[in-house]
């Protein structure tokens, strides 16, 4: 260590140094470094004050004078090996496995080079961004991603903002060809401020795309002017983004916003995962597993795609893309559309009139109470950024409670000649559908807007309508319990019929036995829709089993025992 060696191919002397970067277990434990062509070697060179000698041109040909000048890098490497062999200096050639950087599209080997670049000094700019998170003014959802944010900021280096690309925002720096003076200006100067020369050219580099992206929250609003848009929209509330660009985008927006405006650009960062293919692989052009969202939209609709991306999606977690899930979302959209069309067809026959809550039947109050609770649950989960859970609750309510149960319950009333009960059913159907559409709208905006505008005339668009809120007067706990009792009995009857292979078209007499008079009263008040849902020719309520055939098939629920005579 400390001695000088002579490079046989150039006759130039280089020093022998010792550094902890060298892996003593790899190869001989000795390695020649190139500070101008490797990022790790560059750091070693800085520590030991080594000269940075660039030997390549931008087209990857050799630039240093001598035999190899102008040769392609691959050819030059082969020629150097042959020359060392002829000089008797080549001991052996041993293949080693190591990481080689390649272009992500064409696979060409990337050759690192030292180039003059533009940098932003980050040490002082990072401190306010760190303090913003630690003080609570900025938060991450999930909270664990705040550690990623701090990890990058607390170990941040100066930011290289220049890129050698053909497109992008040009760096506003101008050079005088006469004296070499550099000028940074908003507009291109006509003359050099130093020598008065008129021969100037702009820096050929472009800005890092994340530099302009970091300014996006306020630069799009007229900043640095205090425009109405800037005053209203900045800072915003929530940024939704992927965990893979916390460093590239989120951090840079935060420190840029604080530096330029004195304010964090948002108070919450909601992190989502990546959409991967069905095998769990990241979608990429090189793998050819990418899916064009426009193709999905053409086949299934934008709403189905939006719902698919939100279903079962927890903040920060990756999701796998399955076509079956898109089909399921499309089927749900069809379910909503068909149910809405059924309701609107009945409304056309008998326009909806206002109905007092006291005029509603048990099933009406039940579904009104359920959608009331749904509004509360969905809002609470959205406030916690549990968007997937909120969507699942809306899905379950619309598909099961509203479509499969309530609409089927009220069909006999819609066909009834009795105006009062029909009016209550129509008012409830319309009211609950509107509430459901509003809760579904963030996930399926197009179909909900279309249905909403055709369903009512009071509001021009669902987008500017009021968000559903919990109402105490819509809380009907007793009716909820009562209808659950009926639903349990219906499930029991259907289970018996399925086990006996009785088709829905064949009606059968049903006995409901309970010693509790309140339970029998529930069935008495819901006899019609209970018979409809249970495919019963008659519903008989009694306190005991007397008169029921011994061979009757039975099913026990929490509140009653259901019998269906075998002969029936």
Residue ranges and their predicted role:
Residues 46, 52, 257-263:
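Active-site palm subdomain of RNA-directed nucleic acid polymerases
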Residues 1-59, 128-162, 191-196, 219-234, ...:
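NTP-handling and nucleic-acid-processing catalytic cores
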Residues 233-244:
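A short glycine/serine-rich beta->alpha loop
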Residues 101-106, 243, 273-277:
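Short, conserved secondary-structure transition motifs
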Residues 2-4, 12, 21-177, 249, ...:
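Residue patterns forming the tRNA-binding/recognition surfaces of aminoacyl-tRNA synthetases
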Residues 249-259:
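Short Ser/Thr-interspersed hydrophobic loop/turn segments at strand-loop and sheet-helix junctions
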Residues 151-211, 215, 259-302, 317, ...:
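Feature 926 captures the class I aminoacyl-tRNA synthetase adenylation module centered on the KMSKS loop
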């Amino acid at each position: 260590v400390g001695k000088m060696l002579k490079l046989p191919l150039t006759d130039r002397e280089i020093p022998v140094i010792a550094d902890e970067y060298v892996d003593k277990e790899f190869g001989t434990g000795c390695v020649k470094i190139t500070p101008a062509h490797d990022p790790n070697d560059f750091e070693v060179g800085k520590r030991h004050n080594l000269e940075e000698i660039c030997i390549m041109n931008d087209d990857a040909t050799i630039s240093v004078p001598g035999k190899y000048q102008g040769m392609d890098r691959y050819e030059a490497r082969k020629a150097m090996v042959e020359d060392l062999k002829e000089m008797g200096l080549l001991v052996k050639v041993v293949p080693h496995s190591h990481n080689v950087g390649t272009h992500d599209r064409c696979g060409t080997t990337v050759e690192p080079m030292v180039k003059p670049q533009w940098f932003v000094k980050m040490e002082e700019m990072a401190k306010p961004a760190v303090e913003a998170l630690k003080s609570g003014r900025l938060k991450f959802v999930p909270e664990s991603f705040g550690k990623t944010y701090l990890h990058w900021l607390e170990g941040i280096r100066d930011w290289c903002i220049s890129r050698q690309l053909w497109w992008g925002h040009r760096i506003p720096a101008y050079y005088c060809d006469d004296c070499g003076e550099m000028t940074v200006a908003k507009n291109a100067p006509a003359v050099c401020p130093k020598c008065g020369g008129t021969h100037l050219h702009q820096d050929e580099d472009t800005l890092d795309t994340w530099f302009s992206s970091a300014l996006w929250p306020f630069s799009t609003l007229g900043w640095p002017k205090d425009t109405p848009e800037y005053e209203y929209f900045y800072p915003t509330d929530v940024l939704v983004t992927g965990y893979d660009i916390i460093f590239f985008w989120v951090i840079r927006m935060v420190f840029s916003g604080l530096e330029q405006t004195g304010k964090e650009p948002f108070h919450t960062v909601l992190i989502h995962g990546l959409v991967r293919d069905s095998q769990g692989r990241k979608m990429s052009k090189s793998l050819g597993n990418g899916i064009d969202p426009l193709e999905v939209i053409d086949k299934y609709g934008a709403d189905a795609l939006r719902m698919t991306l939100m279903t079962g999606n927890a903040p920060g977690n990756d999701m796998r893309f399955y076509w079956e899930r898109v089909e399921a979302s499309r089927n749900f959209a069809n379910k909503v559309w068909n149910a809405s069309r059924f309701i609107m067809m009945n409304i056309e026959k008998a326009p909806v009139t206002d109905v007092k809550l006291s005029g509603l039947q048990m099933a009406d109050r039940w579904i009104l109470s359920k959608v009331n609770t749904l509004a509360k649950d969905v809002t609470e989960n959205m406030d916690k950024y549990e968007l997937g859970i909120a969507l699942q609750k809306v899905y379950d309510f619309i598909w099961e409670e509203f479509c499969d149960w309530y609409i089927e319950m009220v069909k006999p009333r819609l066909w009834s000649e009795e105006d009062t009960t029909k009016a209550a059913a129509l008012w409830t159907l319309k009211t609950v559908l509107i509430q459901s559409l509003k809760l579904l709208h963030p996930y399926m905006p197009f179909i909900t807007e279309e249905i909403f505008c055709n369903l009512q005339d009071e509001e021009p668009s669902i987008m500017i309508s009021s968000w559903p809120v919990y109402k105490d007067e819509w809380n009907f706990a007793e009716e909820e319990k009562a209808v659950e009792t009926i639903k349990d009995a219906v499930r029991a009857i259907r289970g018996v019929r399925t086990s006996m292979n009785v088709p829905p078209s064949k009606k059968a007499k049903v006995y409901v036995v309970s010693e509790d008079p309140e339970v029998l009263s529930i069935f008495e008040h819901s006899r019609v829709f209970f018979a409809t849902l249970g495919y019963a020719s008659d519903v008989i309520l009694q306190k005991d089993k007397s008169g029921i055939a011994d061979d009757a098939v039975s099913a026990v629920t929490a509140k009653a025992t259901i019998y269906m005579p075998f002969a029936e």
